[in-house]
UniProtKB/Swiss-Prot annotation:
GO terms under cellular component: cytosol
One Pfam family, short name: AIRS_C
Keywords: ATP-binding, Cytoplasm, Ligase, Nucleotide-binding, Purine biosynthesis
Subcellular localization: Cytoplasm
Record-linked CDD domains: PurM (cd02196)
An example Gene Ontology biological process: 'de novo' IMP biosynthetic process
HAMAP family, per database record: AIRS (MF_00741)
Organism: Streptococcus pyogenes serotype M5 (strain Manfredo)
Protein origin, superkingdom: Bacteria
Name of this protein: Phosphoribosylformylglycinamidine cyclo-ligase
PANTHER family: TRIFUNCTIONAL PURINE BIOSYNTHETIC PROTEIN ADENOSINE-3, TRIFUNCTIONAL PURINE BIOSYNTHETIC PROTEIN ADENOSINE-3-RELATED
Length: 340
């Protein structure tokens, strides 16, 4: 018995792995940007930092996955957008530190290589990279029979960005009186899906719930996470924002305090938060306490900006979208986030 046949009998399809590599090359090519060195398939991805033109570069890195949202992608057999979620979760964290994302690497683990399915996943990764302006310089697909079921896979991503040292956003510039501006989310994004799946466990996904304005439930649940890089970068370059919060797992309560020092707090006007229909549906069908919703979900705001009052109009002018003035920074009394 040859080694090749022995490996196949253990559940690893080497030929399918080669096919995956060939299928994804055209998607990787879409993400090319200045600074990329070498080609996909080497032992390490390379990037020439001098091409960024940054004078005092500080590298900022991020890694994340998409949690159990993957289980819905598998359940509904829709794999072409989940990669965008993975990119978004990484690059949105990087932009919150004031850095421009440069490149991205993904890791896919599966029980059985399915070249068509994995190409769909990577096509979504590439689309996310294009939206974020980052290069996909590394991809690892691990076939692990016995670790995962044949139809199962997991997806993780890694991103690196660069910031001018003087433009790093670390919370130290946020001050009392700053205005909190919210940028709309596209939906649930990629957090809270263990609860989401429990709430809708008995649904097929084809339902047209009255709250969802004519959209099928599965389409709303799998709406890809919005990528904020191109919206936020011009604001960072002009030094118009004092703090940025990426509203992910833990919702407002956990993420907003990460924007500022411990002696400050955020006062949020709930009436000005653009709550999306899916959150109203989750609260209703899941019998979730209203205040708990803000502890779990983004509630319609995926990125929050702390801006000096004199810069608010300029920020609104630069953002080609609705901007929601949802609160302000105050001196901390008890809680770090006060929702009124």
């Amino acid at each position: 018995m040859s080694e090749k046949n022995a490996y196949a009998k253990s559940g690893v399809d080497v030929e399918a792995g080669y096919e995956v590599v060939e299928r994804i090359k055209k998607h990787v090519a879409r993400t090319e940007r200045a600074g990329v060195m070498g080609v996909l398939g080497g032992f390490g991805g390379m990037f020439d930092l001098s091409k960024t033109g940054v004078k005092e570069p500080v590298l900022v890195s991020g890694t994340d996955g998409v949690g159990t949202k993957l289980m819905l992608a598998i359940k509904y057999d829709k794999h072409d957008t989940i990669g965008q979620d993975c990119v978004a979760m990484c690059v949105n964290d990087i932009i919150a530190a004031g850095a421009e994302p440069l490149y991205f690497l993904d890791y896919i683990a599966t029980g059985k290589n399915n070249p068509v399915k994995l190409e769909e996943v990577v096509s979504g990764v590439a689309e996310g990279c294009v939206q974020a302006g980052v290069a996909l310089i590394g991809d690892e697909t691990a076939e692990m029979p016995g670790m995962y079921g044949e139809d199962d896979y997991d997806l993780a991503g890694f991103a690196v960005g660069v910031a001018e040292k003087s433009q790093i956003i670390d919370g130290s510039k946020v001050k009392e009186g700053d205005i909190l501006l919210g940028l709309a989310s596209s939906g649930i994004h990629s957090n809270g899906y263990s609860l989401v799946r429990r709430v809708f466990a008995d649904y097929t996904g084809k339902e047209l719930l009255p709250e969802l304005e004519g959209k099928q439930l599965k389409d709303v649940l799998l709406e890809p996470t919005r990528i904020y890089v191109k919206a936020a970068l011009p604001l960072i370059k002009e030094e118009l924002v004092n703090g940025i919060g990426h509203i992910t797992g833990g919702g407002f309560i956990e993420n907003v305090p990460r924007m500022f020092a411990d002696d400050l707090a955020a006062e949020i006007d709930e009436d000005k938060v653009p709550v999306l229909p899916i959150f109203k549906a989750l609260e209703k069908y899941g019998d979730i306490k209203h205040e708990e919703m803000f502890e779990i979900f983004n509630m319609g705001v995926g990125l929050m900006l702390a801006v000096s009052p004199e810069n608010v109009n300029r920020v609104k002018d630069l953002l080609d979208e609705p901007v929601y003035e949802i609160g302000r920074i105050i001196k901390k009394a008890d809680d770090s986030v006060v929702i009124k």
